[in-house]
């Protein structure tokens, strides 16, 4: 499932608006994840997952900035995400199903913050992009 040129353009265009708010967007998406799917908190037992915490801001920023790196390398996601793929497969061992849950909460957060820009075509492009990212991140799981 490869992104079309128009889907790539939609991902990159929205990323330019997300980038200045990466930590806040990421923190909000993680907070939505933990509230909607409390079982996902098990991977973050060492974090303060309360609203506005520094842990949510820091990790949310890492997550969203990793997506930014992926958006800059849409033609070679495998190489761009190789280190993260190794980390998730061999160290963190995150349940692959959680990537779909996080994808959903990221999209909800984007829809809230970018109501005008996050139209149906952009949402479809981001859904496909996040699915491709999840596929790469879980590609080394056995």
Curated annotation (Swiss-Prot):
Free-text tissue specificity from the UniProt record: Red blood cells.
UniProt-listed Pfam families: Globin
UniProt entry keywords in alphabetical sequence: Heme, Iron, Metal-binding, Oxygen transport, Transport
Secretion signal, residue range per the UniProt entry: none
Domain of life: Eukaryota
GO molecular function: heme binding; iron ion binding; oxygen binding; oxygen carrier activity
Any single Gene Ontology cellular-component annotation: hemoglobin complex
Domain Globin positions: 2-142
Subunit-level organization: Heterotetramer of two alpha chains and two beta chains.
PANTHER family: HEMOGLOBIN FAMILY MEMBER, HEMOGLOBIN SUBUNIT MU
Protein name as catalogued: Hemoglobin subunit alpha-3
Species of the source: Xenopus tropicalis
Gene: hba-l8
């Amino acid at each position: 499932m490869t992104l079309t040129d128009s889907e790539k353009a939609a991902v990159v265009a929205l990323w330019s608006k997300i980038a200045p708010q990466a930590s806040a967007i990421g923190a909000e998406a993680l907070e939505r994840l933990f509230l909607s799917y409390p079982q996902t908190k098990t991977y973050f037992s060492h974090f303060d997952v309360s609203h506005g915490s520094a842990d949510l801001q820091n990790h949310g920023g890492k997550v969203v900035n990793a997506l930014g790196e992926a958006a800059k390398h849409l033609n070679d996601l495998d190489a761009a995400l190789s280190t993260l793929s190794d980390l998730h497969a061999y160290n963190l061992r995150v349940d692959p199903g959680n990537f779909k849950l996080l994808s959903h909460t990221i999209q909800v957060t984007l829809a809230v913050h970018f109501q005008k820009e996050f139209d149906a075509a952009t949402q479809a492009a981001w859904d496909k992009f996040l699915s491709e990212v999840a596929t790469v991140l879980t590609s080394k799981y056995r």
